[in-house]
Amino acid sequence: MEKLTILLLLAAVLVLAQALIKKGGGEKRQKEKINFLSKRKTTAESWWEGECSGWSVYCTSDPECCSGECSSYYCELW
């Protein structure tokens, strides 16, 4: 009977430890996600650094424009 009690306690400790480890990993992933999102630049920053084209500039695809919309080979206003 004592062996069974010890085994049950050991199993409970292992399950608890596993749950704590998984919880810690989840917090790390949340921080990574927040860091990824905070690294994004605003439209104004992208335009200022020349990473996208402003309104009425020649374009061939949507990602080239700060507004994200290339229509009839020119960037839309927004």
UniProtKB/Swiss-Prot annotation:
Write out the tissue specificity statement of the associated record: Expressed by the venom duct.
Which GO molecular-function terms appear in the entry?
A: ion channel inhibitor activity; toxin activity
Keywords on this record? Cleavage on pair of basic residues, Disulfide bond, Knottin, Neurotoxin, Secreted, Signal, Toxin
- A Pfam family the protein falls into: Conotoxin
Keyword Repeat assigned to the entry: answer is no
Q: Where in the cell is it found?
A: Secreted
Disulfide-bonded cysteines: 52-66, 59-70, 65-75
Q: Which residues form a coiled coil?
A: none
Tell me which family the UniProt entry assigns to this protein.
Answer: Belongs to the conotoxin O2 superfamily.
A Gene Ontology cellular component where this protein is annotated is:
extracellular region
Keyword check for Disulfide bond, yes or no: yes
Membrane-spanning parts: none
Know the name of this protein? Conotoxin TsMEKL-P012
Main localization of the protein described in the UniProt heading:
secreted
What's said on domains? The presence of a 'disulfide through disulfide knot' structurally defines this protein as a knottin.
